[in-house]
Amino acid sequence: HKPGGGGAVAWSEFQRTAKPDGYSIIGFNIPHIIGQPMLRKDAGYETDGFKPIMWFHFTPNVLVVSKDSEFKTLEDFINFAKKKPFVGTVGGSGTYSANHLETIRLMKAAGIDLTYVPYTGTGPVIPALMGGHIKAAMSYSPVSVNYKDKFRTLAVAADERVAALPDVPTFKELGYDIVGGAFRGVAAPIGTPQAVVDKLAEAFTEANKQISKKQLDLGFVMKYSTGDEAPMLIDQMREAYGDVLGDIKNKK
């Protein structure tokens, strides 16, 4: 386990030292593995330096406010931001993370200016929102489930409503074509034989079935992707986030 750098510490060491023998595997996620190498010269790893085994779930972004917030709906929040540019503070986990990129996409889609406040992880965002230090948070769907008595979720960035949050509208329903979050999976080193990768994918698929009900209850969306589809997801999301990442890169 190698924490740090939003995954970059572990991923860079993995790509440098892991052997393609079927015994070296690592957890990874989108958009981190796309955004970091594109925006940071010192990321230490390459997006295409992994051999995906399986993507096992999707964690949609959610825009949440405290229960006593003046914002009852997404439109309330957007109207406030239009009247007071940059006054609307949105906390999130990290820089160039799924939370950060979704905040930028919301600004572009709604024509508003917000101030994104990066925290070291999801954990510190929660007391910041509870304490009124930020107006809202762009976080992940399990936060909406776990803190439903403390927070109001204005919208979820999924194609359809999340099973554990049936009363929360999607951004799409509200007129904003925003779908995003963190896709999580496991990968092997480049050079690992495909037969080995397929065998590992079978094992992970079976294990994931055993815990899928728990994941759904926590607010995750089950998205299985193995075989040829696994690397295709990276290409699809690289294209989906291309405009936002390109804008950030050009401004640096």
Give the ranges of each region predicted by the language model:
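Short, Asp-centered acidic motifs that coordinate Mg2+ and/or phosphate
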Residues: 24-26, 62, 135-136, 153
